[in-house]
Amino acid sequence: MPATLDPEGTAGAERGASAASDRAPRPPEPGLARCAGTCHALFVFDIGYEVDLEAARQRLSAFGHGRRFRHRSATHTASQEQSFPLVFEQSVGAEGLAEVLPLPFVRPLPEVLISVYPSGALSVAWRLPFERSFEELIALSSALYDDQSLERVSRRIAAEVQQSLGDSVERPRLAQDFEDYFAFHLPEPPRGWQPAAEALWASSGARGGQERALARLLRAERSELSEQEVSDALSQSISYAPGEVVFVDWSAALLLGADVADELFVLELATVELLELRVLDGKLYRGIEEAYEILSRRGHFLRNLAPLGGDLARIARIQADQALLHEGVDNPLKLFGDDYLARLYRAAQERFHFGEWDAAIERKLETLDSIHQKLSDLASTRRSEILEWIIILLIAFEIVMSLAEKLA
């Protein structure tokens, strides 16, 4: 006989399964998920034209050491490694920590990591350990974005290091311009989140709560973001191994993985390059103003006939200095023998708009060259005018002498 169905038994089994499902622990909301890690707050300053790292190393011999890529397969020549910074730790001290305004949920470690670059850049890296909910981490990101106390203390540390380096810094000057960047490192995904990195950076489909929370962290935004803003915030992501991913945005990054020392180094190098591009752009702007002032300068007759050799030499020096700086700005970033690190750098390059900065600098260099050429033409014209006046005076002198002889 065919087996008879037992509706009551089936319904009971379904009710039992439903009850068991209700009793099973549900994953927390993305914002409530707990996470532990470290926020690396980076501040980069320009302390001079360039730094002699060998001389700086001798001055800091007690605690300075070089910095290298540690775990990836990047290979470098000896000449390339000269572009790597000199790194050392320095205690902030109780007074320095007291100057830092209270940040939500974290307290900085009392030591900062300082890196001195041959290009004249100096970075101060703070480490802020945390173990909080992701929503609280977003609040920390927003507070760091608005905070000025860390930058103020970092600038004072940079000035002290600049003084300690002495004559190893050529043309020392602590510029007002600076760059900051915040990298949030999570050794493991927040509890209850999907562990696979690929699930976090899918580029299509509706964005879920995890993606929205990530975007708010990167944009330091307490309120909800639009779908378009979320997609843009997560558009630059790099993954090396299952369970590892790096999201790169213009002011912050999220690094998911156990060991991210190399990734942090690449992001620091990119931030250093961004500052150098900004400083170079400012120097070129001031150089153009100075050159234009020389070109448009007017005075009395004799002043207009004065030679322009000194002015031409000054503009030529500005051109040479800035062209050399522009050529050397990205030297530390031409060192990647590892494709993964190169891809990470390209993601940062895209986020920081290096292409636009390079184009603006090239235009300013061309403008400076154009002014130099016009000034050179003006100098040639003045030389011709001076020669003409000399000839006129000689002719007049001959006429006067002839008349004087006849009258005598």
Regions found by a protein language model. Name each.
Residues 71-73, 151-155, 275-276, 282-285, ...:
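Short, surface-exposed, polar/charged, turn-prone segments marking secondary-structure boundaries
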Residues 279-405:
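Membrane-associated alpha-helical segments
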Residues 255-289:
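Switch/coupling subdomain of P-loop NTPase systems
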Residues 226-242, 265-277, 310-324:
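Short charge-dense sequence patches
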